[in-house]
Amino acid sequence: MGEMHWIIRHTQRLQWHRLLPLCLCLIVFMLHAPFSTLSAQESQTAYNFLRLPVSAHAAALGGDNISLVDDDATLIFQNPALINDVSDRTINLNFMTYMEGAKTASAAFLKAAGERGTWGVTAQYMDYGSMKETTADNQELGTFSARDIAIGGTFAYALTNELSGGVTAKFITSYIGSYNSLAVGVDLGLNYYHEDYDLSVSAVARNLGGQFKAYNDDFDRIPLDLQIGATKRIGQSPLRVSATMSRLNDWSEGFGRHFAIGADVLLGQSIYVAAGYNFRRASEMKISDAEGSSAHGAGLSLGAGLSLERFKLHVAYAKYHVSASSILINISYAL
């Protein structure tokens, strides 16, 4: 019996050593951002709808969370490595109000692939509504519409009992009036989860790739985002805290603006309430007037969720634009 136990442990150690170089290469690749993106700002990238959170639970925790381990299909949009804990054959629908006249919707379907794998397909759509079309001297020519679409496929695999990896490949297109652009992007994710300590640590590289068809002669970057994050339950209490650092490929701004923090309180097995704060969003939406400057609540997010055996409902409130507040709703059902 002791000899068999030694063989099992030795085999697991050999498997880990075979996987370790792959994991280290992925981490090094993520931490060494392309030099061309070091000073890239949001205004210099296209398809910025990909920066918006899709998961209401992640949105409530500050918007950038990549380390939440839960039976929540929307986490496929935050970190592809997180979907191994999602129920088999889960279908998910999401809707969010954005600024006036703009709406965004998304959907996902996830299915188990063997004992250690999970695959999923996703779709995201953003409609900016109708806008006035004018000449250079402000003469009205009519109206035009704009919309963005992304379609993706994801595969995640449990490398060990604690470590999972995932990859999402996506096709992205955008329409502005009669103009159209096309791009491809890849998300890479790692998650380490220690069940005994209820500790989750993740690293994600989002939107690796670029345009292959521009609106005109000038090609735009897609919004590359390197992120690290952790989530920890405090002892046996119902309190769970999270911290995420995003845009680690862009250090042209202050250190503190890279952080989003959040906490959720688990009210039994089925209900949670959550709150978070995003320092970048608060800074970007700060407005100055005669009385000083204020973010007017931007940066703060709130949310709650109900998780039953087959049905999940999550709702979050936040501000992603200076002109309006946003409500994000997720509905999931395991078939």
Named regions from a protein language model:
Residues 12, 19-24, 57:
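A periodicity- and composition-biased signal for non-globular, repetitive helical segments
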Residues 21-34:
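Bacterial N-terminal signal peptides
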Residues 1-5, 24-27, 263:
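Low-complexity, intrinsically disordered short peptide segments enriched in small/polar/basic residues
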Residues 1-17:
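N-terminal secretory signal peptides that target proteins for export/translocation
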Residues 41-335:
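Subset of outer-membrane beta-barrel
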Residues 35-40:
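Sec/Tat signal peptide C-region and signal peptidase I cleavage site
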